[in-house]
Design a protein with these regions (language model features):
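Cysteine-rich micro-motifs
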Residues: 122-132
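Sec-dependent bacterial lipoprotein signal peptides
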Residues: 1-30
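Conserved SAM/SAH cofactor-binding pocket of Class I
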Residues: 153-156
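N-terminal pre-ligand scaffold of iron-sulfur
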Residues: 32-119, 135-140, 158-175
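Strand-loop microenvironment adjacent to phosphate/nucleotide-handling motifs in alpha/beta enzyme folds
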Residues: 143-145
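Short proline/glycine-enriched turn/loop segments at secondary-structure junctions
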Residues: 147-151
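Processing junctions and N-termini across compartments
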Residues: 24, 100, 121-124
Length: 175
């Protein structure tokens, strides 16, 4: 099951890359995706299915923020091995209800304390500092507006894998 999830994420990332290349060619330019956030570990474990139902996302448009340094979400049982990426992890249910995970650090600002936030009115994510907006429910963290979308090396949100195990556990991990 874990291999299937990893394979799906690989196929999704390849599809995003293909769309980006095609869109760049169609626009007459050579834009490339830039993910130059510093490396940071991600290890968020939901050991049982009821933990996932409580703390994860189980339906379209649900979202939750995991920031270890701020102990968010409040009451979540982080372990000694837990890590939440460079700026935290935004966990969302995409338009089909499938979970997706993104680093919360704005890829334009590249600082761990300048984070994106989920906009419930527009069902996307945005950076209040630079004004960039990102599609997180149907376009894999691609920028849709603001400096992230306007650069020649446009900035996408860093994605993380969500793996399932044989005993009903879920893990958010860095590929």
């Amino acid at each position: 099951m874990v291999m299937l999830t990893v394979f799906r994420n690989l196929v999704r990332n390849l599809a995003v890359a293909a769309v980006c290349v095609a869109a760049g060619a169609a626009a007459g330019g050579c834009k490339h995706v830039s993910d130059d956030l510093p490396p940071a570990g991600v290890w968020i474990v939901f050991p049982f299915e009821h933990d996932w139902r409580t703390w994860g996302v189980t339906a379209p448009l649900q979202h939750r923020e995991f920031i270890l340094s701020e102990r968010l979400p409040q009451g979540f049982n982080y372990s000694a091995a837990s890590q939440t990426g460079y700026g935290g992890v935004l966990l969302v249910g995409d338009i089909n209800g499938a979970p997706a995970a993104y680093d919360m650090s704005c890829p334009v600002e590249r600082k761990p304390d300048i984070r994106i936030a989920y906009d419930e009115d527009r069902n996307d994510a945005f950076c209040a500092h630079c004004g960039s907006r990102y599609s997180v429910i149907n376009n894999y963290g691609q920028p849709t507006a603001g400096p992230a979308a306007e650069r020649d090396d446009y900035r996408v949100l860093r994605t993380y894998n969500i793996a399932t195990g044989p005993n009903g556990e879920y893990r958010v991990i860095r590929p």
